[in-house]
């Protein structure tokens, strides 16, 4: 096996397994909550939309950390790598505290932005107030994981994630349904299970992080100063990613608000498909993570031809995997929706939505690898921001509003028209990739 394939497998496989396991257990969680009825499904789904904003913003911070750490490790400049880690960790914790305050103090007001259904808002507020405290361990765990993956210790976050989802699923069973003498807590029990599992995840990663830096003989350096780039460069990089990811996730929330106003059946149908969508994307997310590290290290060493060649190999792997998984999803869509105890019309809508998603999945995956991994590894985050803003707000959102409020289509028509904006993203990203101007060494 070549050195490239070894590095690809050491990063991609653990990340893929971690994402797949988390999405799989998310499906189990969704099915458990689904036994409580459509109101609970919808409430948890809407809470997840706000949490998506947090996850994407923290993901942006860890992406910046990964870009810089990978390039500086490739250039064998550990001091700059540690500076990147330190600044990103502080940034992540501040952001987590702000989101905790918003979700913990104003849950009903936030949920009211998505739906007018009082029962959904009241049910979701109970869940939201508890889940908000999980933002702190999620932020810290993400930044620590970025360092570990850049050092090719991706198995640590994987095992941490495996343990966390197992804890979460077990506690969900015990607390939602009141098993083994415990009280039947319903949706509140699901929230408590999520909170405990996130602290478990952080504890596992922190121990693994300490052991790995000792094994690698890395001497931690506490420094908020850079020598190869300026603070201004760092802030521009992180702010463009934050703006990009925030506006993208905000767009997802606008779309969810539109779905919410289409009625409970349409919203429930879309919500029950979300775990499967996460599973499909997660199954191939390891390639995006691996691309960021592998290509970033090549750029740090100024090996531009190798970076371009290896990028294409990762893209081909992603396309093949996405096509295979899409075929499987089309065949099994009806089996999945049949697991839910919901109205037959909701099941049928969910089945059709999954088939539409399967058709677009290869395009989504290529966009993830190109935009989220390869092109960003060069540090030029501005162009990705522009693509995200134009794709979401100039194409996606207008199409969504047009389909829902002008054409008066149901959830299937709205989702199908909206998702065509992924094609625009792919065309633009491929043009940028072939021009090679994204290949920049920060060292």
Describe each model-derived feature in a short phrase.
Residues 20, 24-42, 111-118, 174-185, ...:
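Helix-terminus/linker motif at the lipid-water interface of multi-pass membrane proteins
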Residues 10-29, 130, 141, 164, ...:
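Transmembrane helical elements of multi-pass membrane transporters/channels
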Residues 1-15, 69-136, 182-239, 295-360, ...:
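Short alpha-helical transmembrane segments in multi-pass integral membrane proteins
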Residues 3-31, 35-36, 52-68, 93-100, ...:
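N-terminal transmembrane alpha-helices
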């Amino acid at each position: 096996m070549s050195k490239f394939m070894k590095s690809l497998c050491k990063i991609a496989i653990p990340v893929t397994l971690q994402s797949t396991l988390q999405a799989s257990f998310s499906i189990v969680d969704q099915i458990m909550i689904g036994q409580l009825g459509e109101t609970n499904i919808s409430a948890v789904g809407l809470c997840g939309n706000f949490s998506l904003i947090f996850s994407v913003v923290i993901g942006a911070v860890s992406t910046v950390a990964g870009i810089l750490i990978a390039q500086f490790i490739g250039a064998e400049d550990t001091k700059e790598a540690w500076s990147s880690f330190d600044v990103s960790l502080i940034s992540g914790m501040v952001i987590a505290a702000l989101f905790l305050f918003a979700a913990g103090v104003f849950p009903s007001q936030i949920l009211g932005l998505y739906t007018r259904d009082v029962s959904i808002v009241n049910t979701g507020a109970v869940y939201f107030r508890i889940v908000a405290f999980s933002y702190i361990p999620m932020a810290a765990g993400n930044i620590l994981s970025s360092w570990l993956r850049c050092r090719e210790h991706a198995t640590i976050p994987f095992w941490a994630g495996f343990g966390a989802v197992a804890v979460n699923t077990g506690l969900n069973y015990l607390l939602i349904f009141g098993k083994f003498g415990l009280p039947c807590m319903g949706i509140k029990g699901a929230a408590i299970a999520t909170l405990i599992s996130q602290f478990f995840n952080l504890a596992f990663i922190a121990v693994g992080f300490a052991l790995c830096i000792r094994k690698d003989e890395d001497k931690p350096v506490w420094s908020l100063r850079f020598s190869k780039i300026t603070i201004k460069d760092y802030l521009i990089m992180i702010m463009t990613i934050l703006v990009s990811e925030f506006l993208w996730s905000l767009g997802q929330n606008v779309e969810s608000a539109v779905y919410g106003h289409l009625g409970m059946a349409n919203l429930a149908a879309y919500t029950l498909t979300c775990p499967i969508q996460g599973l499909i994307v997660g199954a191939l997310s390891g390639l995006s993570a691996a691309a960021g590290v592998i290509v970033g290290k090549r750029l740090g060493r100024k090996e531009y031809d190798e970076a371009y060649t290896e990028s294409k190999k990762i893209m081909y792997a992603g396309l093949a995997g996405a096509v295979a998984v899409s075929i499987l999803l089309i065949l099994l869509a009806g089996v999945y929706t049949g697991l839910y105890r919901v109205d037959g019309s909701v099941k049928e809508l969910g089945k059709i939505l999954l088939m539409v998603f399967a058709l677009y999945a290869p395009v989504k995956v290529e966009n993830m690898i190109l935009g989220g991994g390869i092109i960003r590894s060069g540090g030029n985050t501005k162009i990705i921001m522009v693509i995200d803003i134009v794709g979401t707000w100039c194409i996606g959102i207008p199409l969504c509003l047009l389909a829902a409020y002008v054409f008066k289509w149901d959830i299937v028509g709205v989702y199908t028209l909206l998702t065509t904006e992924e094609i625009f993203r792919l065309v633009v990203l491929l043009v940028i990739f072939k021009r090679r101007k994204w290949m920049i060494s920060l060292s």
